[in-house]
Amino acid sequence: MILTNHSLIGVALTHKSIQYSIIFLIALGSHYLFDMIPHWHYRTPSIKEAVNAPFGKRTLRVSSAPYDEIMRIILDLTVGLGLSLYFFSASPMVIVVGVAGAVLPDLLVGFGRFYPIRVLVLHDRFHKWIHARHMLDDWPLIGITSQIIIAAILVFLLR
């Protein structure tokens, strides 16, 4: 699922709460729950591997400049935050905490590409394990439409 959808779903489920820890944990859990549903992703293929370098630094091998992918992720995150602020009347802090919890798992996967430390590798394995086995990446019309429908239903029902 794209970050916009995870943001909207996480905030839809938590915007009426005032306990930041509860908001964060429910939004975090929603990420894993909704990743079980077949969905579409945009690709981020340019980062191939991280290798050890002198003095413990990581050196990335990339197939192309990853700036387009990074900008796509930033735009996706910004749209999700903006739509969450638009649709829900909760305090901005509640919305930011909900968005943060909802998108953290995908951001951890991304950080794991840069810094493949044990905790991030274990998280990546768990994230892949819990993920839907059937992906809609090759059917963007179906995948994107299904994500819009899921987010719209939750926004409408929980607003």
Where are these regions (language model features)?
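N-terminal membrane-targeting hydrophobic helices
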Residues: 1-159
